[in-house]
Amino acid sequence: QFLYIEWMNEAYENYAFILYKTLIIRIAMLVAIFTFVKTADDIVPYAIVMSATTILNYLLSFLWIKREVSFVKIGLMELIKASKPLLTMLLLANANMLYTLLDRMFITKGPDENYISYYTIASSIVMLIASVLSGAINVSIPRLGYYLGKKDYESYKNLLNQGAALFYFLIIPTSIGIMVLGNYAAVIYSSEKYLEAGIVTSVFAFRTIIWAIELILGKQIIFINDHENRLTAFYFIGGGANILLNSLLYFNNIFAPEYYIATTIIAETVVVLLEIYFIKKHHLLDLKEIFTTLTRYTIVSLG
């Protein structure tokens, strides 16, 4: 992990290198798997292939960025000073454990072991698609930071609104489509044995809309404007609400996965409302255009 430096390549917008490197390594990984993994018992060869490709991926990224960035000596006091924001980032990166991962922990306590399968299938279907679509805005974060660093607020606003419009154009119709076709998606992904995961998939798809709103407000507005401390606090407030709601379901012997997704929706809605209030209070951005775009695509998709 000490070689993991992909975020630096993203910061320098080396996306062509990331694309070609990833394609080559993934192809090599597939060839190696089909060559060395012959049976279900070939666990060691599979582990070696996966470990080797991961190390190669990290090493190539490290060597590439080393051409542009040099090592610098950091004193002990500077290291201690830098540890505080790094601790905040650590908490921010792991705050998701208080949402969907927490839901799974409670669901596993239920009497029906299929419940966790339904939740996992729904999560895999929806988030697999959502994570691909979110790439449309994730690549813009370094450029947004660049504009803010230059105090070019007009360019920042234009790029943010364009990215949000593209993201919502992709994610809103997709989420509503999965909501309608949840049963079919579950069957295609996991066979008719898990047909009951269909309703869970539909509810999870609705949750993705809230997730998409939070992604823009949290990452591209609050976080990029150096308010990661407040963003972390909002995530933990929402996580606390999710713990409370999940506990309420647990003590009432309710373990159906759709109810736990509903608690996550409520918790993430709390986070979104806190973020909207914070953005308006500190005048970080006029949110009218973003929510107008969101409403427009929602109406068109429902129509």
Residue ranges and their predicted role:
Residues T35-T39, M97-L128, Y146-Y147, N183-K193:
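Helix-terminus/linker motif at the lipid-water interface of multi-pass membrane proteins
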Residues Q1, L160-I213, G240-N252:
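Alpha-helical transmembrane segments of multi-pass membrane transport and lipid-handling proteins
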Residues Q1-Y20, A205-I237:
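Membrane-interface junctions at transmembrane-helix termini in multi-pass inner-membrane proteins
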Residues A122, V126, A130-A164, Y168-I171, ...:
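Helix-loop junctions and terminal segments of transmembrane helices
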Residues Y12-F17, L23-Y58, E228-N229, G238-V272, ...:
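Membrane-interface helix-loop junctions in multi-pass transport and translocation proteins
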Residues F17, E78-T88, L166-F167, V200, ...:
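Membrane-interface "helix-start" segments
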Residues I43, K81-M89, I107-M127, E154-L159, ...:
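Interfacial/gating helices of multi-pass transporter permease domains
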Residues I43-V49, L59-T100, M105, V139, ...:
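Interhelical loop/hinge segments that connect adjacent transmembrane helices in multipass membrane
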